[in-house]
């Protein structure tokens, strides 16, 4: 078995700040979707921790679904094409859709997902993103509910990973991979 390389990690957003902001986002979403037919679609895998905490705090009735797309290779390297790995199961035509994402960086993956969802005729599509890496944006993506704006750093924790590691950290940290 190959040795696991250690990486330098520092806390960017502590657990307490995450919990507070998620509660604020849930309250805002509750206000905006009172009396509406809301379907929440999480973008796998990174959004799961955020999505679960957010949905537990909502009081409006919801349906839950998932979508998975990728544009990343091993070690976080960005590839140019967006690949759909898992599509939604529930019909969204005529419904309000809230897409829940962990991080928006270049915007390419989310733009593709949003275009696909809008093509299916929902009543509305809004985006809730825990993290916004605006300085890395290459294409415009409207974020309706934003948790935190962060610098252009590689981040892990609270669902975000580096080679499938660090997802279970209860905070958002920045990581600096060590050289082999």
Predicted features, each with a name:
Residues 1-180:
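PRPP-associated nucleotide enzymes
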């Amino acid at each position: 078995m190959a040795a696991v390389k250690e990486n330098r990690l520092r806390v960017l957003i502590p657990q307490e700040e995450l919990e507070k902001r998620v509660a604020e986002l849930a309250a805002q979403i509750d206000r905006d979707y009172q009396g509406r037919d809301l379907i929440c679609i999480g973008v796998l895998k990174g959004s799961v921790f955020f999505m679960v905490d957010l949905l537990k705090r909502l009081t409006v009735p919801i349906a839950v679904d998932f979508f998975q797309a990728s544009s990343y290779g091993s070690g976080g390297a960005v590839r140019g094409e967006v690949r759909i790995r898992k599509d939604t199961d529930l019909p969204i035509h005529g419904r309000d859709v809230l897409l829940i994402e962990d991080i928006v960086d270049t915007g390419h993956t989310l733009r593709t997902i949003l275009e696909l969802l809008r093509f299916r005729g929902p009543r509305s599509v809004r985006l809730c993103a825990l993290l916004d890496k605006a300085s890395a944006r290459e294409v415009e993506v409207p974020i309706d509910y934003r948790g935190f704006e962060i610098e252009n750093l590689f981040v892990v924790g609270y669902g975000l990973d580096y080679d499938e590691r660090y997802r279970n950290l209860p905070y958002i940290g920045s990581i600096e991979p060590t050289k082999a």
